[in-house]
Amino acid sequence: MDQPHPPENAETSIGGAPNGFIVEIPTLKSLFIEMCFGETVLGTGTAFLVSNNRESHCALVTNRHNLTGRHQETGKCLSNTGGVPDNIVIHFHKNNDFIGEWLPVRLPLYRSDGSPYWFEHSKLEENADVVALNLSWGGDVRKVPYYLETELDRFGIAIGPAEPVSVIGFPFGYSSTARFPIWATGFLAQELSLITPENPTFLVDCRTRQGQSGSPVLAYRVGNYRKIDGDKLSSVLSPTPIWEFLGIYSGRLNSESDIGRVWHASAVADVLAVATADALRREQKAEGHV
């Protein structure tokens, strides 16, 4: 049994009295969102930030159906008011030394010409229930993204069917405390090797409900876990928690079942790349390069 080297930024929790709550880093990464028409809240959900690494572009990711306000497959309006959102309120962590304070930021979802601000999958487009939003960052919010290309969030944990996975979000808009998310834990319901570029999704067996759409899905391990290192598989005993970002939860297959669909991390990476390319084009245009 191997002893692991710590991943980049081996801290796994943050905060503490008198500077707020002590929470695991993944707890900080799930953000409560409200989908609104004007000032009217139509529904709630979950979002999170993603970036490839600490120096690269950062974007907000959630489910497409959260922003359209319509069922991803049927197109049916999700709100019993019959309304669809035209803006979103994101509850960011305040950028101070106190963990446990939030700053709600309201952002429009559509430009003046009616086109959406969000970015869709480069190949699957509107058929993928994952989108990204570019934001203008100020110093008043704390950015705690999932890093898609570092060992902090992608440690190389080997995960098979029936192993635990966690969906970290806000079922029915509920929180554990204040605006901290709830960890709902279930099991991987298939082999990840069955994921294809044409259908970058996998199934989990987890008791989830509305409001958890857009939640990050993790394999979170304390103690023993299996690690992939090239073509080798080893058993590792870790003194600190380790986690693997797997993807974004998008909802149950059937209202009477606990089987839910997750869009794989590769789909999240795709919409991040689309958002990053647009941000770069706008930056170059502003500088007069194009």
Question: At which residue positions do the language-model features occur?
Answer:
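A conserved glycine-rich beta-strand in the N-terminal activation segment of trypsin-fold
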Residues: T40-A59, I259
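Short beta->alpha transition motifs characteristic of CBS
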Residues: N63-N66, G169, G247-N254
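C-terminal subregion of chymotrypsin/trypsin-like serine protease catalytic domains
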Residues: P6-P7, V23-P26, A219-V290
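Long protein-protein interaction modules used by eukaryotic assembly/scaffold proteins
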Residues: G20-I25, V50
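Serine endopeptidase catalytic core focused on the charge-relay Asp
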Residues: L28-L31, G43-T44, K76, N80-N199, ...
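Structural detector for hydrophobic anchor residues on beta-strands
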Residues: G43-G45, L60, A184, F245-L246
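N-terminal targeting leaders that route proteins to membranes or the secretory/organellar pathways
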Residues: M1-N19
